[in-house]
C-alpha cells in the first residue's frame, strides 16, 4: 500500500474495473427486492455543470447504499437530446444540430464516467435517435385514435421578417432575437393532448404521494387549479347572440356593473368591424404577449365595444368592454366584473369611471370604504333582492339554483390547467406522425411507416426549419394516395415524459415497452431533480404514466414513489464596470481574495490587479461567469473529494455554497482515512475481537463505532440527511485518530472500525473505499459487500450520567452503573458533597426520578 492518498492513481483503475466487469448491469431478478433510482436526464449542452454533479452524486449515493442493503438496483442514464439550443449552436458553429449533439453526448458521458457514477450504460437512451422516438410517434397516433389528441388554432409569436415562429425565450422586449423586428401574435393550427381529461386524476393522485415534497404537490395543485363555480349565459342586447362567463363568486352576481372580454373574443372582433379605434386597440392587445404572471402588475387598459349584455336576473344592461387583462385561452375569454368585490375589476372601474355596486357586507357589520379598494372577503349579501342576509355558501347555492331554473346558468367544476400544446415549429425535434391527404383529411401515420425520421444531415440557415424549407421531405403516400407529412415537431417535454419507462427495456423492438420488464422495475423508487420542474416536466411525466397505464403498458398509477428536489449550487460572483458602464463578470477562479478574521471577503482583485465588486453568492450561471468546471475540480482534487464535498456542504434540498476551501478540507479528510489504514496495516490485528475482554476505554470506543453505524444507516437510508451522516463519520474518525493501537484488542477494534468506516463512506466516495477495502485484506470487492450492521449489544451504555437537582437547580452530576436501582441512585445522590451542602438544614418533602437522566429533591 502506498503511503500517500493519490486519487489520480486510484480512480481511473477502479473505473476501468467497473467497466470491464459490468459491475452495475441491472438484470431483472424476481427473487430480489428491486430498487429503481433515477436522476433527471441532462440536456447535452456540451459540459456538465456543478448542478448536474450534485444531482447525480445524490442519486449515486442512494443507489450504492440500496445495493449494499441487498436490493436489485437499476440506475440508468441518458440524454434529453432534442431542443432549441442545438439549433442556435449549429448556426453559430456552422454544423448540423445532430453532429453537435452527438459530440456533446460523448464528451459529457466521459465526464460522468470520470465521476464514478454507478450507471448501467447498456440501458443508455438518447431521445433524438429514431429507435426511441418511433414509439413516441406510435403512442401519439394511438392517443389520436382514442380521441385524446386534437388540432386547433392557437396563438404563437411570429417574426414577419424571418416568417417563422419564435419560442417565448426568443422574444426580447417584444422583438425577434435575430433581426429585432417587432414580433406579432398569430394564430396557427397546433396539436394538443387532452391533459384536462386527466385533471381530476392528476389532482387526486397527489394524495397518494406521501414521499413527494409538499411544496411540489402544492405547486401542482395550484397549477391544475380546480375551482367550483357557475357558468352564466348573458344575452346580448338587440341580438340573438349570447356570451358565457364563469365565476367562482355567484354571491356577487347582483353587483355586476360591466363585462370584460379578451381582444380575440368574437364579440370584440364584431364590434371592431365598424370602429377603427377599437380595431387598433384590439391589434395592440394581440401584439402584446402577456404572461399570466404579469397580469396582476401590468397597467389595465380597455375600450368600450358599444355592445351591452343583459343581466339574466335584473334585466339591466351590462356594458361590454375589451380589456387587456382578459386572456382568450383562459376560461371563456369573457369575465363578469364586480368592482366592489374584486380588486382588478375595481382598478379598471375607477380608471374608466364605471359603477361600483356593493352587494357584500362584512359579517361583523363594519362599514367599508369602496372609494379606496374593493372588499374581497366573503360576507353577507346586501342589495341582492331575496338573497339579502345570506352568507357565501347559502348565496352560492341560492343564486346558482335560480340561474339553473331560468336556464341561464349551470354549476361547473373548472380547471386552470389547459390542454398540452405539443406542436413546435422547429426543426430539431421528433416529427409529429400525422399526414394530410389531398382532400384535406388528416390521418395518423401507420405503424409500418414509423418512425418518420428527422433528416440529420442538414444545413441550418438560422431562419427556416430544414424540413419546412424542403418541400420534397414532406411528400409521402398513404394507402397509395399522395399525402404530406406534418412539418411541426414535438415539444421536447414529450421525450422526457416517458424516458424513465423506456430505461426498463431500451433494447426492446416489438413495442413501446416490454410490460414484463416495465412492471418489474416501475414505479421509480427514488427520483431526483430540481424543483423548477414542478409544474412542467413533473406534471407531464405523471400524466404520461397514466396514459401508459390506460394503454395497458404499465400497471401502476404514478411513475415514482419518492421525489427529492436538490438545491441549487451557488458560487461567489465578481464584476467590474467597464468604461461603457457595462458589468464585466470575472470567473472566481481568476480572483485573488482578502478576507477578515471572520472569513468575510473584504477585497477582490482579478489577475490584472483590477479591484472587483463582490456580488455575493449567486446561482452558478454563464451570465455571471461564476460556474466552476467540475472537470477541473476532479483533475485537481479527485472525483471522491468533489463527491464528498457535494454531499457534506449542505442538506440535499438546500442551496449549496461552493467553497474551494471546503473541497480542500474534504481532500484532507480522505487523506487522513488513507493514513489511518496505512498505519493500521503496519501491524494489523492477528486475533479476533473479544467483546467480553475489553477495557472500559475500549468498550467506549467500540460503542462510538456502532452508534455511528446506527446513525449513518438511518441518516442515509431513511432521513436522507447525507451531510449529518458524513459529520458523524468525521466525528468517529477524530476518535479513531486518537485511539491506541498498542494492544491486540485495540487493533481488533480498529480493524472493525475501519471496515465499518470504509463501507459507510463507499456510497459517497466509492473509488478510495474500493481500494481501502482491498488494503484491509478483503477478498471480495466492496461493490458486493453488505452494508455494515450496528451491534445492539455494543451500544449498551454500562454507565450513565444522572443530573441531581435541589429545588429545581442543578447541584451535582453523578456517574452510576446503567442498571442501578432508584433507591441506590438516591443514596449516591445524597452522598454527593455539593448536594449535601444545599440540603443542609432542610427536610426532603418529595423526590422525582427521570430514569437514567435526572434525580430531583424538593426540600423545605
Swiss-Prot record:
One of its GO terms (molecular function) is aminoacyl-tRNA deacylase activity. It catalyses: tRNA(Leu) + L-leucine + ATP = L-leucyl-tRNA(Leu) + AMP + diphosphate. A motif ('KMSKS' region) lies at residues 619-623. One of its GO terms (biological process) is leucyl-tRNA aminoacylation. GO terms for cellular component: cytosol. Its main location: cytoplasm. Keywords: Aminoacyl-tRNA synthetase, ATP-binding, Cytoplasm, Ligase, Nucleotide-binding, Protein biosynthesis. Its EC number is 6.1.1.4. ATP binds at residue 622. Gene3D superfamilies: 2.20.28.290, 3.10.20.590, HUPs (3.40.50.620), Isoleucyl-tRNA Synthetase, Domain 1 (1.10.730.10). A motif ('HIGH' region) lies at residues 42-52. CDD domains: Anticodon_Ia_Leu_BEm, LeuRS_core. SUPFAM superfamilies: Anticodon-binding domain of a subclass of class I aminoacyl-tRNA synthetases, Nucleotidylyl transferase, ValRS/IleRS/LeuRS editing domain. It is an enzyme of class 6 (ligase). It is found in: Cytoplasm. It comes from the Bacteria. NCBIfam families: leuS_bact. Belongs to the class-I aminoacyl-tRNA synthetase family. This is Leucine--tRNA ligase. The gene is leuS.
Amino acid at each position: 500500500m502506498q503511503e500517500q492518498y493519490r486519487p489520480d492513481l486510484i480512480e481511473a483503475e477502479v473505473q476501468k474495473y467497473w467497466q470491464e466487469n459490468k459491475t452495475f448491469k441491472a438484470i431483472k431478478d424476481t427473487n430480489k427486492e428491486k430498487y429503481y433510482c433515477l436522476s433527471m436526464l441532462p440536456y447535452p449542452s456540451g459540459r456538465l455543470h456543478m448542478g448536474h454533479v450534485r444531482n447525480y452524486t445524490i442519486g449515486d449515493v442512494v443507489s450504492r447504499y440500496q445495493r449494499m442493503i441487498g436490493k436489485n438496483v437499476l440506475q440508468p442514464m441518458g440524454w434529453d437530446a432534442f431542443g432549441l439550443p442545438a439549433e442556435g449552436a449549429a448556426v453559430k458553429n456552422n454544423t448540423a444540430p445532430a453532429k453537435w449533439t452527438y459530440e456533446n453526448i460523448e464528451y459529457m458521458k466521459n465526464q460522468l464516467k470520470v465521476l464514478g457514477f454507478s450507471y448501467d450504460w447498456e440501458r443508455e437512451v438518447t431521445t433524438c435517435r429514431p429507435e426511441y422516438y418511433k414509439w413516441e410517434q406510435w403512442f401519439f397516433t394511438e392517443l389520436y385514435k382514442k380521441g385524446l389528441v386534437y388540432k386547433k388554432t392557437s396563438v404563437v409569436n411570429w417574426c414577419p421578417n424571418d416568417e417563422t415562429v419564435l419560442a417565448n425565450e426568443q422574444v426580447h422586449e417584444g422583438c425577434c432575437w435575430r433581426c429585432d423586428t417587432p414580433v406579432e401574435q398569430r394564430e396557427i393550427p397546433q396539436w394538443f393532448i387532452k391533459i384536462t381529461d386527466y385533471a381530476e386524476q392528476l389532482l387526486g393522485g397527489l394524495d397518494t404521494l406521501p414521499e413527494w415534497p409538499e411544496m411540489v404537490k402544492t405547486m401542482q395543485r395550484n397549477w391544475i387549479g380546480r375551482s367550483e363555480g357557475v357558468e352564466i349565459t348573458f344575452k346580448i342586447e338587440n341580438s340573438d347572440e349570447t356570451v358565457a362567463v364563469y365565476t367562482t363568486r355567484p354571491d356577487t352576481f347582483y353587483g355586476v356593473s360591466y363585462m370584460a372580454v379578451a381582444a380575440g373574443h368574437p364579440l370584440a372582433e364584431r364590434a371592431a368591424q365598424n370602429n377603427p379605434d377599437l380595431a387598433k386597440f384590439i391589434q395592440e392587445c394581440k401584439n402584446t404577449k402577456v404572461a399570466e404572471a404579469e397580469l396582476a402588475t401590468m397597467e389595465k387598459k380597455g375600450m368600450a365595444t358599444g355592445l351591452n349584455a343583459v343581466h339574466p336576473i335584473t334585466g339591466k344592461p351590462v356594458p361590454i368592454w375589451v380589456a387587456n387583462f382578459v386572456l382568450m385561452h383562459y376560461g371563456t375569454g369573457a369575465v363578469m366584473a364586480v368592482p366592489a368585490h374584486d380588486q382588478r375589476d375595481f382598478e379598471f372601474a375607477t380608471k374608466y369611471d364605471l359603477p361600483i355596486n356593493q352587494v357584500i357586507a362584512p359579517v361583523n357589520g363594519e362599514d367599508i370604504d369602496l372609494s379606496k379598494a374593493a372588499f374581497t372577503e366573503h360576507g353577507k349579501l346586501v342589495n341582492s333582492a331575496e338573497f339579502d342576509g345570506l352568507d357565501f355558501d347559502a348565496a352560492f347555492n341560492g343564486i346558482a339554483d335560480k340561474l339553473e331554473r331560468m336556464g341561464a346558468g349551470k354549476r361547473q367544476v373548472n380547471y386552470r390547467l389547459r390542454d398540452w400544446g405539443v406542436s413546435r415549429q422547429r426543426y430539431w425535434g421528433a416529427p409529429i406522425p400525422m399526414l394530410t391527404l389531398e382532400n384535406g383529411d388528416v390521418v395518423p401515420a401507420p405503424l409500418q411507416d414509423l418512425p418518420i425520421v428527422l433528416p440529420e444531415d442538414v444545413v441550418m440557415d438560422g431562419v427556416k426549419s430544414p424540413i419546412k424549407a424542403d418541400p420534397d421531405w414532406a411528400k409521402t403516400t398513404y394507402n397509395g394516395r399522395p399525402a404530406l407529412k406534418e412539418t411541426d415537431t414535438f415539444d421536447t417535454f414529450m421525450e422526457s415524459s416517458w424516458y424513465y419507462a423506456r430505461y426498463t427495456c431500451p433494447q426492446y423492438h416489438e413495442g413501446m415497452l416490454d410490460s414484463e420488464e416495465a412492471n418489474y422495475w416501475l414505479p421509480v423508487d427514488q427520483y431526483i431533480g430540481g424543483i423548477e420542474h414542478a409544474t412542467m416536466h413533473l406534471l407531464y411525466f405523471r400524466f404520461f404514466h397514466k396514459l401508459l397505464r390506460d394503454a395497458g403498458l404499465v400497471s401502476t398509477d404514478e411513475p415514482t414513489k419518492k421525489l427529492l428536489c436538490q438545491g441549487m449550487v451557488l458560487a461567489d460572483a465578481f464584476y467590474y464596470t467597464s468604461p461603457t458602464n457595462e458589468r464585466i463578470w470575472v470567473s472566481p477562479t481568476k480572483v485573488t481574495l482578502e478576507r477578515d478574521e471572520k472569513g468575510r471577503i473584504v477585497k477582490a482583485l482579478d489577475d490584472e490587479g483590477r479591484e472587483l465588486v463582490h456580488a455575493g453568492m449567486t446561482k452558478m450561471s454563464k451570465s455571471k461567469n461564476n460556474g466552476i468546471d467540475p472537470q477541473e475540480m476532479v483533475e485537481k482534487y479527485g472525483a471522491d473529494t468533489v463527491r464528498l464535498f457535494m454531499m457534506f456542504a449542505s442538506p440535499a434540498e438546500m442551496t449549496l455554497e461552493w467553497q474551494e476551501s471546503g473541497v480542500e478540507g474534504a481532500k484532507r479528510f480522505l487523506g487522513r482515512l488513507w493514513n489511518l489504514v496505512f498505519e493500521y496495516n503496519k501491524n494489523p490485528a492477528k486475533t479476533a475481537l473479544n467483546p467480553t475482554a475489553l477495557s472500559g476505554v475500549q468498550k467506549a470506543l467500540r460503542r462510538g463505532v456502532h452508534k455511528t453505524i446506527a446513525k449513518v444507516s438511518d441518516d442515509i437510508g431513511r432521513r436522507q440527511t447525507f451531510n449529518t451522516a458524513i459529520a458523524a463519520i468525521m466525528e468517529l474518525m477524530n476518535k479513531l485518530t486518537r485511539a491506541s493501537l498498542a494492544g491486540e484488542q485495540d487493533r481488533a477494534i480498529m480493524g472493525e472500525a475501519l471496515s465499518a468506516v470504509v463501507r459507510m463512506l463507499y456510497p459517497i466516495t466509492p473509488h478510495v473505499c474500493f481500494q481501502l477495502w482491498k488494503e484491509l485484506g478483503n477478498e471480495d470487492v466492496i461493490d458486493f459487500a453488505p452494508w455494515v450492521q450496528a451491534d445492539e449489544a455494543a451500544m449498551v451504555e454500562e454507565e450513565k450520567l444522572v443530573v441531581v437537582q435541589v429545588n429545581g437547580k442543578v447541584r451535582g452530576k453523578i456517574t452510576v452503573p446503567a442498571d442501578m436501582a432508584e433507591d441506590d441512585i438516591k443514596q449516591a445522590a445524597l452522598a454527593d458533597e455539593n448536594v449535601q451542602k444545599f440540603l443542609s438544614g432542610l427536610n426532603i418533602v418529595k423526590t422525582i426520578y427521570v430514569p437514567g437522566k435526572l434525580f430531583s429533591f424538593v426540600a423545605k
